[in-house]
Amino acid sequence: MLPRNATDKIQGNVSKPCFWKSLSPGQNWKSKSMRSFPEEFVKSTPGAFEHRVVFSVRWGNSWQLWLEREEKDLFMIEEDWDEFVDDNHLGPNDNVFFRHDDKMFLEVQIFKNDGNEIIDAPPEVEPETEPFHPTTPKNSHKETTTASASASASEFSDNWRETHGCADIKNPELYLLNPKNPYFVKTLTKGNDVLYVPKTVIKKYGLKFGPHLSPMHYLLPGDKINGSTKIYGGGSAPCFNGWVDLCRKYNLKTGDSMVCELERSGELVTAVRVHFINKT
């Protein structure tokens, strides 16, 4: 556990609601008590955490965790929390700091007992590919649609998957509308609802984003999906929400790949043009 003066120093620079998690004797990171939110934290963020929460870390990864209530206590779903623990290799010498950022979003920092912060992804974690979880967990909140709308969406997505593939993309620059635009290849893995721009791409093209919550768009053939820009990690981890809506609409699955072409207005990135790759 970090010394009290170290936690006070870190927490003293934070104006938003926050809390710490570290192990007590007899606990492990997958103990049920580690999945709960402090009561004071929940009270200080009324309405922010109804059905799910999104954790973001400094190296660009994020995790969506569904929530459940037991009487007055709020817990993260066991499967989702365990995935976060495993992905970050949390151990007995780790201290995790959670800070409320906006609505259901939390910024997460991991510190060792010596006070050093973990700022790089574990070897097994790919910081430039955020995961997408296409299924809804048991007992989680479910959005409702009319029968006709549901059938129409299902027919549309099934037809799309018949004509598009997700094999490794060679020569992605050939798919760009403007060869001078920044781009990257996105492959879906497991568990998130925002689109991160790889830090290597940001650095290569000198990209700028924002301001926080400013509108942006996903551009597809004959379609436009609205989203917004999110800025985390002091500006070092920009991302776009609305990505989960695109994934659901086009029935995207784990392993699907596409080319993401970034459109700029002035100096700022304001749109992502998504190129699906036809089967050969």
Curated annotation (Swiss-Prot):
**Primary site of residence:** nucleus
Against PANTHER family, the record matches this protein to: B3 DOMAIN-CONTAINING (PTHR31920), TF-B3 DOMAIN-CONTAINING PROTEIN (PTHR31920:SF125)
Residues annotated as DNA-binding are 20-114, 183-276
Name of the protein in question: B3 domain-containing protein At5g25470
Entry-linked InterPro entries: B3_DNA-bd, DNA-bd_pseudobarrel_sf, Plant_B3_domain
State the GO CC annotations: nucleus
Gene3D superfamilies attached here?
DNA-binding pseudobarrel domain (2.40.330.10)
Question: What Gene Ontology molecular-function terms does this entry list?
Answer: DNA binding
State where the protein is found. Answer: Nucleus
Q: Which UniProt keywords apply?
A: DNA-binding, Nucleus, Repeat, Transcription, Transcription regulation
The beginning of the lineage is: Eukaryota, Viridiplantae, Streptophyta, Embryophyta, Tracheophyta
The segment annotated Disordered runs over 122-153
What the entry lists under Pfam families is as follows: B3
